[in-house]
């Protein structure tokens, strides 16, 4: 399998303008295709590898003792998978499953650590990544305990939205599916569908083929509880 032009975009983000970092990543990485639905990592695995998503989407998932699926997060192109286990030397704490066909750069854990030791800017970016993920996990734990299912959906919609040309509106683009939104939050699809339909009836959102528009961001934010 050969490197493609799009692959280099994911690497360039972490190279941070330093050509040597990008070249070092390519030198130690091998490419792998992961079909949709395939487990890249299984909980409890003791793999000596780190993964950089070049294309596609990977979902981090754990299962409760009763078999209930809990979605920890969704990782897109340009994001790392398995970096914590590489740094701690521990077993993998969650499943990593391809949500769509994906291309992955596979790095030996030792090479990943060497990159951090060699390039300070790379180490700083990885440290920032770990801090952001810890903050996101803490936020989700708080929301799970403090908010209703509807409140968590409202909060996630605002979080995923970006401003558009109309300063009074927010946009979710590309448009998420109800199934994807439910999975992100570990909420039943039927519940999520009812909440979204209610927002449409209240004329707070408009669902279009390519995007969702939040017509009244403040009103939606005020409903979070």
Spell out what each predicted region is.
Residues 61, 83-84, 114-115, 156, ...:
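Residues that scaffold the ATP/ADP-binding catalytic core of kinase and kinase-like folds
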Residues 158-225:
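Phosphate-/nucleic-acid-contacting segments
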Residues 1-36, 85-86, 118:
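Cyclic nucleotide-binding regulatory module and flanking cytosolic helices
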């Amino acid at each position: 399998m050969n490197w493609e032009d799009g692959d280099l975009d994911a690497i360039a983000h972490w190279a941070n303008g330093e050509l040597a970092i990008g070249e070092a990543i390519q030198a130690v990485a091998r490419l792998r295709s992961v079909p949709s639905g395939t487990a890249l990592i299984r909980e409890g695995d003791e793999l000596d590898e780190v993964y950089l998503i070049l294309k596609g989407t990977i979902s981090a998932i754990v299962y409760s003792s009763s078999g209930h699926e809990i979605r920890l997060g969704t990782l897109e192109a340009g994001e790392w998978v398995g970096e914590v286990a590489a740094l701690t030397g521990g077993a993998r704490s969650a499943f990593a499953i391809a949500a769509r066909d994906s291309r992955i750069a596979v790095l030996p854990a030792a090479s990943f650590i060497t990159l951090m030791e060699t390039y300070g800017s790379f180490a700083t970016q990885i440290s920032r990544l770990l801090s952001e993920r810890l903050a996101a996990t803490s936020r989700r734990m708080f929301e799970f305990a403090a908010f209703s299912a509807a409140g968590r959906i409202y909060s996630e919609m605002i979080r995923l939205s970006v401003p558009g040309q109309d300063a009074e509106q927010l946009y979710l683009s590309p448009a998420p599916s109800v199934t994807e939104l439910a999975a992100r939050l570990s909420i039943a699809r039927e519940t999520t569908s009812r909440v979204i339909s209610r927002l449409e009836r209240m004329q707070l959102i408009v669902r279009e083929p390519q995007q969702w528009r939040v017509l009244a961001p403040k009103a939606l934010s005020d409903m979070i509880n």
